[in-house]
């Protein structure tokens, strides 16, 4: 089986790695991870002949201009890639990539590759595209072997590209051209062998670059929104609704949660969405005209039992005697958590279905039917949907609004209305924050001066919905405040987002990047973000040479510097081997007297 070495070059973030991964795995990678140097392999059949195709990925950033050419020896064919929606990457072919290959590996065939073809014609991107005609003109001008336009996302022309590359590498014309090449052509060993008869010198072999290792995986902590909502329900704290039953103990709940979860209760309490039916009239509720409800009593109430400010009213609802407490409490639990609580199939599930259908809550009926039909494994997806829906509806109805508010936060002199039931149970710190011992003035909590309004609003939105606007906000500020409030899942979300920002910000080059990665590492160390700390340590260590030249490097403590130096990539022994290799090459050039062509 003939072995073919194919090297891919081009600017950072044009899609080189995606091209190789999509070709070798038939799958598109979900996230961009800047390549240091990586290798892939594939066994393919072209024109009935088997080939072992060695695929060499390279880093396009200028930080690796010295090391990248060490991947070029014995190359059979190059792919120079540019993004069709990045004119700068196209212009760099003539300015950088072609001269680099011509210098280090003359006479090796080159195929020009346009990537991200799926973005062609997307006018909303507002980026100047490179036309196929321009690419073909460049092919003719520089003498490339051909041009192929591809999409790794859609698998467009991938097989055609690599088939062309293999045919180009194995064509008689290419073999003839390689024989004319310098040391870095694939036939350099035979060239040097013949030359050694007069020079008694052989071409030094470049040192093998050790792998850099993969970046640490950042795990997102699983949402516990349903468990937190159950804790809120069971605690009965801040409740402003009491459901009563004939000769059974009552069920306490919260209007803001019931309204966020159910159109039926929005109509009962009078806080409807534009898509809801009209609210029930109080007279109809008290005259038995609304199914399942006997009466509704509303009483003014300024204080909760613990002495803290209430939502202003306390509502008592008498439930019809045809509904037993267990079934009704299951309904309320399901509204809060999205989880169906039952012992077995005989645990009054039919009665629960009847109640759910009478109040128009189809999701509870579906969950019960799934259990009865042996499809209970479908219920977790219903719960996830309901948790998200509750959060989104609570945001629409109540977020920062005075309606039913029972607490205010003062941040940077601005007042923010909130609802204790919707933020309770998220963490012990949050619970302490809204408890009676912390509140300095009636129903108000004044945040410290170092808390910014925008970051606090992001935290509050997360407390309501289990989602935070990290992309639109200050992700670092949100992480710092999330750690202060002991919101570990939010911290993990910020860690992942910031890690992706690091990868995106360094596509132009690590030394030139405006992002302060060392500052992010120090922040992660100070604010209990261990996953981000490990990611930054790996990134700085894996890009040691450009990172150590940044002025922020001096801010690192001795322990951190030692860790980075001990784990630096490329390792010191490899860099020393590179220096020795370069010295040997210089000696060889000096002694070759003309037969070595630069």
UniProtKB/Swiss-Prot annotation:
Residues 175-210 are annotated as: Disordered. The keyword Repeat applies. Pfam families: BTB (PF00651), Ras (PF00071). One of its GO terms (molecular function) is GTPase activity. Residues 182-197 have a biased composition (Low complexity). GTP binds at residues 11-17, 57-61, 115-118. A motif (Effector region) lies at residues 32-40. Residues 239-344, 405-472 form the BTB domain. One of its GO terms (biological process) is regulation of cell shape. One of its GO terms (cellular component) is plasma membrane. Gene3D superfamilies: P-loop containing nucleotide triphosphate hydrolases, Potassium Channel Kv1.1, Chain A. Keywords: GTP-binding, Nucleotide-binding, Repeat. Interacts with pakB. In the N-terminal section; belongs to the small GTPase superfamily. Rho family. This is Rho-related protein racA.
